[in-house]
Amino acid sequence: MKKIILIGGGGHALSVLEMAEDLSLFEGYADLQENVDMSIPYLGTDEEVMANYPAGEFQIHHTLVYAKDVNLNLRQKMIQKYAAYEKATLIAKTACVTPHSRIGSGTGVFHGVIINRARIGSNCIVNTGAVIEHNVHAGDNVFVGPNATICGGVNIGNNVLIGAGAIIRDDVTICSDVVIGMGSIVTHDITQTGVYVGCPAKFVKSI
């Protein structure tokens, strides 16, 4: 198995290492600077990693998450930057992913997650304690926050952030490039890109 390089060395990268448990899986991490809290080697900037660690010999896992000023395109640009590399899928031992579920390449599934006969795209993050029910189809680069609940039959586009504790009602469709605020409840289809918050969730601003 090819060793994994984490792209990013911030707080989420620390969570990935805790979730994976076996540090021998990792070659190290790339970032603009070293983080002394990381327990794997610092390999340099993106440019240094791509020059010294060939795509054919290593796989990567993206750990960049969204900051307060949510920029959905930033993570997508980083994914494209490393397009030549194989993407490592990481699933915590304590997660429950049923046999008929499908998890895309580069996706991370964290502790206590339940995924029940759902399809999750590539380069997604399903964070601690989230529940994704039957017949959910999530696209690529989707972030599901801690303890969020996505009920059965929901369809989610690409580049979507669902905040911690949010609830998506069954059979709802959410288009691409959408942010659902923490604790919000989505009761109807979302067909316009933007930020939605509240109970029920309502459009508050463009991205």
Where does each model-flagged region fall?
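Active-site phosphate/pyrophosphate- and oxyanion-stabilizing loops and adjacent acidic/basic residues
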Residues: 18, 76, 184
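Short glycine-/acidic-enriched loop or helix-start segments at secondary-structure transitions
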Residues: 16-17, 71-74, 190, 206
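A solvent-exposed beta-alpha-beta segment
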Residues: 1-62
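Short, well-ordered secondary-structure micro-motifs
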Residues: 39-41, 100-101, 207
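Residues at the C-termini of beta-strands that transition into short coil/loop
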Residues: 30-33, 46, 64, 91, ...
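Phosphate-bearing ligand-interacting subdomains
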Residues: 37-92, 96
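Structural signal for interior beta-strand "rungs" in well-ordered beta-sheet cores
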Residues: 89-204
